[in-house]
């Protein structure tokens, strides 16, 4: 996803939305009809079916990934406290699809008992998450109306005393916490929660605290084989919507504005019962025109080069796709050769990053070697690829930023691992002879998966030809 900000006044928003319905009603209706014909209205099944699949992913993640990662980082016991609506970033990797927030205060405790017994999982507050955790509740019984007496939930400072009891029973040599100055995904423990916990546990236990660092990062990044199977379908859906958006079913040259296309793309997801993790964006490049001359929300004209950035969110998993399109001029039957060459150049840069992205290498190492090959082949480009999964800009080793091509300290020093996904995001700029050697930017983004053996695969495929508006 590119960082892009468009500020629209309410009047501009209403005008943009009105233009879809009043200026090009037939195109919009056709787009909706075509999309409905080609994509089921429940592309991933009912919510219940989706939740059952997600619950299986959670169980496998806890049974398979968590023990391996705790041992990889030498973590005996991991404590993850959080309060309702102030959840740790790793929350998404720890809970069932029917859990949307922490319960009052929830303290998850993970204790590695060794390869034979596995990892003990406790929930001090909150529920068992479909049998994944053993919950602890308060001792007192309270009257619950017609249900009679019911065991109370853990509440307030007493929860820390229950945690202290758990620690005293298990006597871990160290206690890993989510505090980090490097990784946002490993820095989920709030200052208030830290203070309350430290005060209740006392100095003897506080001395055993240590940062969890890579554990929450890699747990968030770790993908299950069935998630990979699902991701192909999710990526296909993103492609389907982009293909329709960059066609005459949505775009009428000389009438449709880029904001019309953006809102159509977002609305299409809402109509399917899905969501996105960022506002879709569309931009144009035009022969002889600068960005300033085009303005914030230009009308799409014949001869324009189109670019979009689009993400789908489904079953808590995210896609991130950037594609190129072209609006044929009157009498044109194909994309000018110079523009085709520009797309081919960015495809070549994709090849390079695809080949360099390997488990065991740091993000900065991947960036450096990719840029060296890029320079040796005379490509004028930038690389800013990132992990993706439970978050759009996901946990794991960062491979460049658009404005930090020398490397990213900290985040870029983390290592790529097997069983994770990336968005290969980059751009190559080329001179286009048909445009009087104007510089044209071909920006592409496609998602890839890395399997358990470290092999890299496109999540579905990658764009090698322009989408055409005729």
Which sequence ranges carry the predicted segments?
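Active-site neighborhoods and metal-handling regions in enzymes and metal-associated proteins
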Residues: 24-470
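Bacterial N-terminal signal peptides
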Residues: 8-16
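Bacterial signal peptide processing site
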Residues: 18-20
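Ser/Thr-centric signal marking residues that sit
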Residues: 3, 15, 451
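Bacterial N-terminal signal peptides that target proteins for export
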Residues: 1-9
């Amino acid at each position: 996803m590119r960082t892009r900000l468009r500020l629209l006044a309410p009047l501009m928003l209403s005008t943009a939305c009105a233009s879809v319905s009043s200026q090009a009603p037939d195109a919009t209706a056709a787009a909706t009809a075509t999309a409905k014909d080609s994509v089921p209205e429940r592309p991933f099944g009912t919510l219940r079916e989706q939740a059952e699949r997600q619950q299986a992913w959670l169980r496998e993640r806890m049974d398979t990934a968590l023990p391996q990662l705790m041992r990889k980082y030498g973590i005996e016991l991991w404590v993850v406290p959080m309060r309702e609506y102030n959840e740790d970033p790793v929350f998404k990797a720890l809970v069932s699809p029917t859990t949307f927030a922490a319960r009052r205060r929830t303290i998850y405790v993970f204790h590695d008992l060794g390869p034979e017994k596995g990892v003990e999982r406790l929930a001090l507050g909150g529920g068992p998450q479909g049998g994944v955790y053993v919950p602890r509740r308060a001792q007192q019984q309270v009257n619950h109306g017609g249900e009679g007496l019911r065991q109370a939930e853990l509440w307030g400072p007493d929860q820390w005393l229950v945690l202290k009891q758990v620690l005293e029973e298990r006597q871990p040599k160290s206690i890993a916490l989510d505090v980090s100055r490097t990784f946002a995904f490993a820095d989920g423990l709030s200052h208030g929660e830290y203070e309350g916990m430290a005060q209740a546990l006392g100095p003897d236990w506080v001395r055993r605290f240590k940062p969890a660092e890579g554990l929450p990062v890699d747990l968030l990044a770790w993908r299950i084989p069935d998630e990979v199977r699902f991701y192909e379908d999710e990526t296909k859906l993103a492609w389907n919507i982009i293909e329709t958006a960059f066609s005459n079913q949505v775009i009428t040259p000389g009438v449709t504005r880029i904001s019309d296309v953006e809102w159509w793309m977002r609305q299409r997801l809402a109509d399917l019962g899905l969501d996105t993790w960022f506002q879709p964006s569309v931009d144009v490049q035009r022969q002889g025109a600068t960005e300033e001359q085009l303005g914030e929300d230009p009308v799409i004209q014949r001869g324009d080069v189109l670019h979009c950035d689009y993400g789908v969110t489904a079953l808590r998993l995210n896609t991130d796709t950037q594609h190129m399109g072209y609006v044929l001029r009157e009498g044109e039957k194909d994309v000018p050769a110079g523009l085709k060459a520009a797309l081919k150049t960015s495809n070549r840069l994709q090849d390079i990053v695809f080949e360099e992205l390997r488990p065991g290498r740091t993000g900065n190492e991947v960036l450096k070697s990719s840029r060296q090959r890029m320079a040796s082949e005379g490509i004028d480009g930038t690389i800013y690829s990132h992990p993706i999964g439970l978050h759009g800009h996901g946990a794991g080793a960062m491979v460049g930023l658009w404005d930090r091509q020398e490397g990213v300290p900290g985040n870029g020093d983390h290592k790529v691992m097997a069983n994770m996904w990336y968005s290969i995001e980059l751009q190559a700029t080329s001179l286009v002879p048909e445009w009087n050697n104007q510089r044209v930017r071909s920006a592409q983004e496609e998602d890839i998966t890395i399997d358990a053996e470290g092999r890299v695969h496109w999540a579905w495929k990658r764009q090698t030809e322009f989408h055409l508006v005729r």
